[in-house]
């Protein structure tokens, strides 16, 4: 049992985290073993280090922390047993992918991913799958570079073709003059 002072400390800590986080995702964790949750935390730690956490916190404490961090419309997520995934560093979409794939791998009901906030915007359980299917920041950068690079590559090939043709014409003129 936590003392009042410990609870106040948790609320203060969570409020500060929620003010600077890019992702808050609420999930029902019942049915998972301690080993399962340890595996999920390991996957997150492998990708994010200390930049992401999956934490079980009492709903009353989460409610106070979210209220202090000035979030609105979160009450629907705090029904039943609730764990919270939050990301303070790195790509938040990748964290959604990790937990979504974890639930899929464990054959858990995906609706148990209750929803949350991505970059301050609320999303529902139904939208979790759509977010998980978004490309990561690295993939988006690669697509952007590919799109920028394609016209430049085309220009290089066009210019090299013109130069090649010029060389052929000059060689033909040289051969004609040498005859």
Swiss-Prot record:
GO CC entries: cytosolic large ribosomal subunit
SUPFAM superfamilies: Ribosomal protein L10-like
GO biological process, one term: translation
GO-annotated molecular function: large ribosomal subunit rRNA binding; structural constituent of ribosome
UniProt cross-references to CDD domains, sorted A to Z: Ribosomal_L10 (cd05797)
InterPro entries in the cross-refs: Ribosomal_uL10, Ribosomal_uL10-like_sf, Ribosomal_uL10_bac, Ribosomal_uL10_bac_type, Ribosomal_uL10_CS_bac
Residue ranges of the region described as Binds L7/L12 dimers: 137-179
Record bears the keyword RNA-binding: yes
Keyword presence, Heme: no
Keywords in alphabetical order: Ribonucleoprotein, Ribosomal protein, RNA-binding, rRNA-binding
HAMAP family tied to this protein: Ribosomal_uL10 (MF_00362)
Family under the similarity heading: Belongs to the universal ribosomal protein uL10 family.
Protein name (record): Large ribosomal subunit protein uL10
Species in which this protein is naturally found: Thermotoga maritima (strain ATCC 43589 / DSM 3109 / JCM 10099 / NBRC 100826 / MSB8)
Upper lineage: Bacteria, Thermotogati, Thermotogota, Thermotogae, Thermotogales
């Amino acid at each position: 049992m936590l003392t009042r002072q410990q609870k106040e400390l948790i609320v203060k800590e969570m409020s500060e985290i929620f003010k600077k986080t890019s992702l808050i995702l609420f999930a029902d964790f019942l049915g998972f073993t301690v080993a399962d949750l340890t595996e999920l935390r390991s996957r997150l730690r492998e990708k994010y280090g200390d930049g992401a956490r999956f934490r079980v916190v009492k709903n009353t404490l989460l409610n106070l922390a979210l209220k202090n961090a000035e979030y609105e419309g979160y009450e629907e997520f705090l029904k039943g047993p609730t764990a919270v995934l939050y990301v303070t560093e790195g790509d938040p979409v990748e964290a959604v992918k990790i937990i979504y794939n974890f639930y899929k791998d464990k054959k858990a009901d995906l609706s148990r991913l209750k929803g949350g906030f991505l970059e301050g915007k609320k999303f529902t359980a139904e939208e979790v799958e759509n977010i998980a299917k978004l490309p990561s920041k690295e993939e988006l950068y690669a697509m952007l570079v590919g799109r920028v690079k394609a016209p430049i590559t085309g220009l290089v090939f066009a210019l090299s073709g013109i130069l090649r043709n010029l060389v052929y014409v000059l060689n033909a003129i040289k051969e004609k003059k040498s005859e």
